[in-house]
């Protein structure tokens, strides 16, 4: 297990334990993106109360959000894609976001702010918040409304 910290612009942090034994490809990719500073300056662009917060793909400048892009896709490490991954999508679990294509995850991730058992076996869960303070930060972010720029 390795540990990472997501540092927010308001000074709060989200501490996360990464589980290499559950999703080795996903953790390796996530750590590579961290080492490359890929996530620096990105925002949580999708927040849904009592569900999750999603980030890892967009930059916000106060007026609009822009997709960052440029990250390679990886194999989806979850049961419906033929990979054993029994990490339950409970509160605080971090998982890879993807399109309907099972091997389309790249940099976007989400952190569950509630129990999301319906996601089990469908998305590559690969870690969990390390402490109650981090989970409280996730839950508070999930209550922030986001806007559509369509």
Name these PLM-found stretches.
Residues 1-150:
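Cyclophilin-like peptidyl-prolyl cis-trans isomerases
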């Amino acid at each position: 297990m390795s540990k990472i910290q997501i540092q927010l612009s308001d000074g709060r942090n989200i501490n996360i334990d990464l589980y290499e034994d559950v999703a080795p490809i996903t953790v390796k990719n996530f750590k590579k993106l961290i080492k490359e500073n890929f996530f620096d300056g990105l925002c949580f662009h999708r927040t849904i109360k009592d569900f999750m917060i999603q980030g890892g793909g967009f930059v916000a400048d106060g007026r609009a959000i822009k997709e960052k892009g440029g990250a390679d896709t990886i194999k989806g490490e979850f049961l419906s894609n033929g990979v054993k991954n029994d990490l339950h999508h409970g509160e605080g679990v971090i998982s890879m976001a993807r399109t309907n294509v099972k091997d389309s995850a790249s940099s976007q991730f989400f952190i569950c702010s509630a129990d999301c058992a319906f996601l089990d076996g469908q998305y590559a869960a690969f870690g969990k918040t390390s402490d109650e303070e981090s989970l409280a930060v996730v839950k508070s972010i999930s209550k922030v409304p986001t806007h559509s720029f369509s």
